[in-house]
Amino acid sequence: GDRQAPEGFYHVTPALMNPNSSYHLSFNMGFPNAYDRANDRTGSFLMIHGACSSAGCYSMTDEYVEEIYALAREAFKGGQKSFQIQALPFRLTPENMAKHVNSNNFEFWTMLKEGSDYFELTKQPPKVDVCEKRYVFNRAVAEGERFSTRTECPLTEMPRSLATAFATRPSSRAISNLIV
């Protein structure tokens, strides 16, 4: 890649789809999201598109963007309100994380790993919120509480079944055991 495109969790709605793109087909991935704005990241029109060339966007062949675009279009026709994009640097397995433990981005990638692990465990997109300028995943807050991007996180709870599944996943300890 061009090392300019952001990483994180994004949601695409029908309004972000662009069938008239100069790059064949495209859709705006919704950058900046709440996390990006809380961390003063700016920009706009970060697109996923065809034409296989880009600066700051995610490009792919026309064939691949047509496939993704068709799936999104049909999901929206079927009543789905949005779809999630997980823009990750690599598969966030313990082995891959161990290879990058000295990266300046390791702490950020560890945060993203929680959302990625949820998807791998459940095959469902994680519920994503932001508080204290960080992502939080699959958390429920008490009635009357809410997440705020720049303030302290409210008390949260993870559903018991999910907490049990997370307790059995390869963790940070597994990553440290792989570091040579």
Kindly give the residue locations of the regions a language model identified.
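Exported/periplasmic cell-wall-interacting domains
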Residues: 1-153
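C-terminal non-catalytic accessory extensions
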Residues: 157-180
